[in-house]
């Protein structure tokens, strides 16, 4: 930082305590491979407890959590692993895994081509994983990810907020990101059926940062099938 304060240093790490490399004397951030596995596995096994466990371990409210206040590099695929569109068993989960990656603590990183759902498997080698594209494509997934990026960019809570689990089932999860100035609830429904969520929201209404629509918490919150929301709370 003393030599060039605006030069961001990030390291590629797999296992172990990331604090060994991510600290005031070394790197600003490292790749979050622990949550990479938890992200796709939670959808494929329909077990949101897995990714929630990792997020609580890394960023939860307890004093012992590993990386509270730090910003790991979040990703759902990269140049060394099977592309997420090829690893998910249900294509309806593709937008949702990005909503989870952008909503959780960390710096989301999108691998080129995956923003429109490019497919490739690790067993087919580097040429498949690192393909050349003639031009970018734009589809509904691209539009959705761009909305997630816009929401993340302008939200203090999504960038710097604490992490707290609010509601958790095998197929749904709601967690809170909170700073002194803003509170956002990230809600995911991975099921093919609507889900009525009952919890203490602490306020009456919110605005979904993805759609811009107002959400009323009165009488419960219905999550549509295969849906995600970033509810910015009224207080």
What are these regions (language model features)?
Residues 1-67, 100, 117-147, 151, ...:
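Active-site-proximal helices and loops of the catalytic beta/alpha 8
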């Amino acid at each position: 930082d003393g030599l060039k304060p605006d030069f961001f240093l990030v390291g590629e790490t797999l296992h172990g305590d990331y604090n060994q490399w991510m600290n005031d004397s070394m790197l600003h951030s490292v790749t979050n491979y622990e949550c990479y596995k938890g992200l796709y596995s939670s959808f494929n096994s329909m077990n949101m407890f897995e990714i929630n466990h990792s997020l609580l371990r890394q960023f939860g409210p307890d004093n012992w959590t590993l990386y509270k206040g730090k910003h790991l590099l979040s990703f759902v695929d990269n140049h060394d692993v099977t592309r997420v569109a090829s690893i998910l068993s249900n294509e309806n989960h593709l937008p949702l895994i990005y909503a989870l990656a952008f909503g959780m603590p960390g710096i989301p990183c999108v691998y080129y081509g995956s923003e429109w759902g490019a497919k490739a498997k690790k067993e087919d080698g580097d040429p498949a994983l690192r393909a050349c594209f003639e031009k970018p494509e734009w589809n509904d997934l691209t539009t959705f990810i761009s909305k997630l990026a816009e929401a993340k960019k302008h939200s203090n809570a999504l960038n710097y907020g604490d992490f707290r689990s609010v509601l958790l089932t095998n197929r749904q999860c709601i967690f809170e990101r909170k700073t002194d100035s803003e509170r956002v609830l990230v809600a995911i429904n991975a099921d093919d059926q609507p889900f009525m969520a009952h919890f203490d929201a602490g306020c009456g209404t919110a605005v979904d940062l993805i759609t811009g629509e107002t959400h009323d918490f009165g009488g419960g919150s219905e999550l549509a099938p295969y849906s995600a929301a970033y509810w910015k709370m009224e207080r």
